[in-house]
Amino acid sequence: MVTITSLAKDERSARVALAATLEPDDAVTGRLIAAVGAVETMRLAAGTGAFPKKVDSVDAGLWRNKVSPRLDARTVTQALSETDRLGLHILIPGDRDWPTALNDLGERAPTVLWVRGTVSFLSATLSDRVTITGARAATSYGEHITGELASDLTHAGRIIVAGGAYGIDAAAHRAALAPGGQTLAVMVGGLDRLYPSGNRELLE
């Protein structure tokens, strides 16, 4: 029988298992990973072993009670299957292309990143990347100015980072891609269902 702990056999697979089953931005999860690693954190979530002294016992108990019912090997298996089906890359801290700036988030840093496309953009220096974001219901003037800004930055060799929403985000991507520039789209809803669907062609 496949169990969630048997799937979490190394740091990478354990981080995938944690990310597939737990909420993001969980400080206790981050604290445990920093203290004992992802494999042991998964065992602790499943109810095996004693918590490290670095983690408050009350917080640890509440955390286990919250996450234990969510642990489902099928969820992890499905996440891994979708990763393969969509040709996604899995990045964890320590990988060559992991964006080290995320480490500044400490215990709230992402457990893992799923990436589609060119992963090397993520490890570019911060000064090479510029984030552009704004209203979804943007005016034509707002989209025009966004396009000019993104185009100028692209010609200056910058990588444009934006969400995938309508309006300003989409305008930034289009303007940067038109001359053959590079963009990063941050997809909050996941890479298995590109949203909004009206921007699917742009995002793909």
Where are these regions (language model features)?
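Short, small/acidic-rich helices and loops at N termini and domain boundaries
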Residues: M1-D97
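Glycine-biased, small-residue-rich flexible motifs in mid-sequence functional cores and linkers
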Residues: M1-E11, E23, I92-E204
